[in-house]
């Protein structure tokens, strides 16, 4: 990062940012890409660039766009949202079809749905991975209804590695894709939005308006390039460790884990007997950090800094914490 070649990305002449954008665009077989500070901004500018004020978008009821982006689709893009239910945080083509509303034929009672948003992997679903056939069917249904399709691919490389699918094939039918560099890939900051020239050009305008234009951002893009070159293949190690952690916790008396949902690097643990906040605090005393997702469910995430011995330590901490808050 310290030795990165830099320019001014607001003016479009930072060579390291350009290299990162071009690499992602080529890898995903899209025309162009845009480096942004965060995944939330990437999703926001993608929605804004592909909708009009008063339109509607479709997303899963447990999607990051709906739950964890401060309602940006409404406040910033002026869109309502039609929510789809489905197991493990995933939508079906039928669910998407039923959620799409159009103004035409409704005596102008309905808004126009012009964008369908899919999340892969599905975070709150447990880090689950969509079948490629389902992705293809959702894109087809969207096209038949004159809707564009956006992939919130914050962890799409986890999905690609976990399913053995070529990344470009996975996103072939999506108009835009948001890729996060700072999750499983391990870069300190940044996401990249990829798509066609026109949409990325419009997204560039909204990035500027939202304060996402950065000057010598090549120092950040350099970390993203390193992550792309070195940290994709190794994601399978995180998946394997998450699976071992999940299987061990599932055998403990006071915890419940849906092993079917453990498909990437996340483990959602139901600790109803203790409560999520209490369990979070008990584990923290033993040096294990987790998030409390609901009153009873915590989330543990395995990343590139977690070793096999760390997993062993986490298993021991869960075992001890299910009965007592004290640290021996």
Regions found by a protein language model. Give the residues of each.
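Conserved PLP-enzyme active-site core in the AAT-like
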Residues: 1-4, 8-273, 277-286, 290-306, ...
């Amino acid at each position: 990062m310290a030795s990165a070649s830099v320019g001014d990305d607001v003016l479009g002449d930072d060579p390291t940012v350009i290299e990162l954008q071009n690499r992602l665009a080529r890898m995903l077989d899209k025309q162009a890409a845009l480096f942004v500070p965060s995944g939330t901004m990437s999703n926001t500018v993608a929605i804004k660039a592909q909708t009009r004020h008063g339109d509607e978008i479709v997303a899963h009821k447990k999607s990051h766009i709906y739950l964890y982006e401060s309602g940006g689709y409404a406040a910033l893009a002026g869109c309502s949202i039609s929510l789809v239910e489905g197991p493990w945080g995933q939508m079906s083509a039928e669910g998407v079809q039923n959620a799409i509303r159009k103004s035409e034929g409704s005596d102008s009672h309905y808004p126009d749905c012009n964008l369908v948003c899919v999340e892969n992997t599905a975070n709150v679903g447990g880090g689950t991975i969509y079948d490629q056939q389902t992705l293809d069917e959702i894109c087809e249904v969207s096209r038949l209804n004159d809707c564009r399709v956006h992939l919130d691919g914050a962890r799409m490389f986890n999905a690609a590695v976990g399913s053995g699918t070529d990344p470009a094939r996975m996103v072939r039918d999506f108009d835009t894709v948001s890729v996060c560099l700072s999750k499983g890939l391990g870069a300190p900051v940044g996401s990249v939005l990829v798509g066609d020239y026109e949409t990325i050009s419009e997204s560039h305008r909204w990035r500027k308006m939202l304060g996402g234009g950065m000057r010598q951002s090549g120092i950040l893009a350099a970390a993203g390039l390193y992550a792309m070159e070195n940290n994709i293949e190794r994601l399978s190690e995180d998946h394997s460790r998450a699976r071992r952690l999940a299987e061990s916790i599932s055998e403990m008396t006071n915890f419940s884990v849906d092993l079917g949902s453990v498909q990437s690097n996340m483990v959602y643990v139901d600790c109803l007997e203790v409560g999520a906040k209490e369990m979070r605090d008990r584990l923290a005393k033993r040096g294990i950090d987790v998030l409390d997702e609901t009153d009873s469910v915590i989330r543990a995430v395995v990343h590139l800094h977690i070793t096999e011995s760390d997993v062993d330590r986490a298993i021991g901490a869960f075992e001890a914490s299910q009965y007592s808050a004290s640290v021996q």
